[in-house]
Structures are given as C-alpha cells and as structure tokens.
C-alpha cells in the first residue's frame, strides 16, 4: 500500500484551522488588530526580539541598552490585556503542536529507542 503522507499533512492543516485552539488564536489576533496602540507595541517588541536573536545567531553581542529596551518593551507588552490573551492562546496552540509532534515522531522515537540505555 502506497501512502501519500503529504495528503495526510494537508488534511491535518485543514483540520487544525477548525480546532478551538486555532480559532481562539485567530480571534485573539483580531482583538489585537482592533487595538492600534497594542498592535504597534506588539510589532515593535517582535521586531526588537527578532533583531536580537539574529545578532545572537551571527555570534554578535547584544548591547546592554538593547537588552534594557527589550526588557522595557516586554514589560509594556505584558501590561496589555489583549496581548496577554493572545499569548495565552499562543501557548494553547503550541501545546497542541507539541502533542502532534510527539505523535508524528513516534515511529522515529521507537527506532532510536532500541539504541538507548538498556535497563537490566
């Protein structure tokens, strides 16, 4: 029997869009977009965080000023209820993805387990 795993993946993608977790995240993004101040703050925080991560990946140091700016932005971001709600929904989606990843990688884990530490 030939299995087209990509058809299964595409079906999973369609089903994911119908989950409560994804719908909740989409609604949280809609709520964020309705609050211009929170949206601007969120976008600025994401940009600063991405820039810092990029520097780290390139082996560059992040300055003390950059760290302080990111920390201040993080404090401002977490003070916004709409962003806190979004972050909670992101965590729910992330949990779902982690669980799916465990299921999907189950066959690989079984293969490698045979070479793991032996009890006895």
UniProtKB/Swiss-Prot annotation:
Check the record and name the SUPFAM superfamilies matching this protein: YheA/YmcA-like (SSF158622)
Pfam families, sorted:
Com_YlbF
Q: Which domain of life is it from?
A: Bacteria
Q: Family per UniProt?
A: Belongs to the UPF0342 family.
Note the HAMAP family from the entry: UPF0342 (MF_01526)
Protein name, entry field: UPF0342 protein LAF_1331
Originating organism = Limosilactobacillus fermentum (strain NBRC 3956 / LMG 18251)
